[in-house]
Design a protein with these regions (language model features):
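Post-HEXXH active-site segment of zinc metalloproteases
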Residues: 104-129
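C-terminal capping/extension segments of zinc metalloprotease domains
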Residues: 1, 55-63, 67, 81-82, ...
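Generic secondary-structure transition motif, activating predominantly at the C-termini of alpha-helices
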Residues: 7, 19-27, 44-48, 122, ...
Length: 208
């Protein structure tokens, strides 16, 4: 939509923050622990994406993370506990990035919200609490955009992480393609996280 293309970057970040806050109220609270939060940032830095990656974690299960305007990514607890290999969690984050680059999440949410919300955004660069609530509920309920395989594999290659561990938790042809075209078939050349850091991230929801 037009609204999604004209919104300044600073406003996208603000809108993403507002949506994250409302999603936390609707489906949270977000999982948090000093060690786990620190490790989440370590993992984001490890992915070599040259962009800020604010990561949030919610309890529950999803097949895909939620991406928000401005770049925030919401993971779900199953994405940390589905495997003993942190490359799987890295894969979920990279898949969210590939999907974000492929299709602006704001555009997807505004298409569902309808023209009135989009016009409000164009007119004022802001949304009412009711409209933020509407978009947050859309983000929670709408299936997220799948990531294009080639773009996802490029992100795995840049991060120097094997795509096979992530592929094994994905069903069907998507998983098969990520294994067949894994840029590191013999395994990730560098550890994704230390064992201690990985355990602290997996336990981020445990103390709540």
């Amino acid at each position: 939509s037009y609204a999604s293309t004209v919104l300044p970057k600073v406003k996208r970040v603000q809108l993403g923050d507002a949506l994250a806050q409302r999603i936390g109220q609707l489906a949270g609270p977000y999982c948090s622990s000093p060690e786990g939060t620190h490790t989440a940032q370590q993992l984001a830095d490890r992915l070599n994406t040259d962009r800020t990656l604010p990561l949030l974690v919610l309890r529950g299960q999803r097949t895909l993370p939620i991406t928000l305007p401005g770049g925030k990514i919401i993971l779900f607890e199953n994405m940390l506990t589905a495997s003993d290999d942190p490359a799987v969690t890295a894969g979920y984050i990279l898949s969210a990035l590939a999907a974000f680059d492929h299709r602006d999440p704001l555009r997807a949410y505004l298409e569902q919200a309808g023209p009135f919300t989009a016009l409000s955004l164009v007119a004022s660069n802001n949304l009412s609490k009711t409209q933020v609530d509407q978009l947050a509920k859309i983000a929670l309920s709408q299936p997220q955009t799948p990531s294009p395989r080639t773009a996802l594999l490029n992100l795995f290659s840049t991060a120097k992480i094997s795509s096979s561990p992530f592929a094994r938790v994905k069903a069907g042809t998507e998983g098969q393609g990520l294994i067949a075209q894994d840029p590191f078939l013999t395994g990730s050349p560098y550890p994704v996280l230390t064992d201690g850091a990985w355990l602290s991230l997996q336990a981020i929801c445990s103390d709540m």
